[in-house]
Amino acid sequence: MSQNEPKIPQATAKRLPLYYRFIQSLHASGKQRVSSAELSEAVKVDSATIRRDFSYFGALGKKGYGYNVQYLLDFFRKTLNQDEITNVALVGVGHLGTAFVNYNFLKNNNTHIVVGFDADETKVGTTMSGVPIHHVDEMEQIMKQNKIDVAILTVPSAYAQSVADDLVRFGIKGILNFTPARLTVPDTVRVHHIDLSIELQSLIYFMQHYPTAEGVHQ
């Protein structure tokens, strides 16, 4: 985010890619304008929250008219840096890592896994879905060559912190952590933790204690 752009709440920032994906779909279908109520129904975020999120960026729409789809598309493409390619490294090419390589964020035009790393000699030197797999000992050199500053971590939890330490040392600025380990990194490095077992347990708890959901979607 540049100095000229507003600093928005983190919760709002996490919803922006969701809005952008739906707006892309609207644009592809030929729709020219959309109301906050229509957006709310599609993305399962209440209208008041959508209007508040959009208000951080100024007047994106007009009362009684809604939002111009083309304008929103252009605005969010610029805000989310969709014209700037982000190269991503995958560290840990096990079952989950292999799934990421095969998927490779096909719906995201600006995000691609360009290299994978693993300690398994049977995987090193192979190519999976067009992504070359290298030994973890080669991370520093290859990451610098490819100007990578984002990594997905899917290694065994016992190795997560030491691998994260290496990633930080190699200049990584963002880590998407799929291991159960809670990583310690400098303030200059952003980590998002995604623990699938915790998410599943949380889902089951909410099913049991909040069965009607009341319009709340996580």
Swiss-Prot record:
Membrane-spanning segments: none
Binding site for NAD(+): G92, V93, G94, H95, L96, G97
Name of one Pfam family that matches: Put_DNA-bind_N
GO biological process, one term: response to redox state
Ranges annotated as DNA-binding: 18-57
Record localization: Cytoplasm
A GO molecular-function annotation: DNA-binding transcription factor activity
Keywords: Cytoplasm, DNA-binding, NAD, Repressor, Transcription, Transcription regulation
This protein's GO CC annotations: cytoplasm
Transcription keyword on record: yes
Subunit comment: Homodimer.
Functional description taken from the UniProt entry: Modulates transcription in response to changes in cellular NADH/NAD(+) redox state.
HAMAP family named in the record: Rex (MF_01131)
The family this protein is said to belong to: Belongs to the transcriptional regulatory Rex family.
Protein name: Redox-sensing transcriptional repressor Rex
Organism of provenance: Exiguobacterium sp. (strain ATCC BAA-1283 / AT1b)
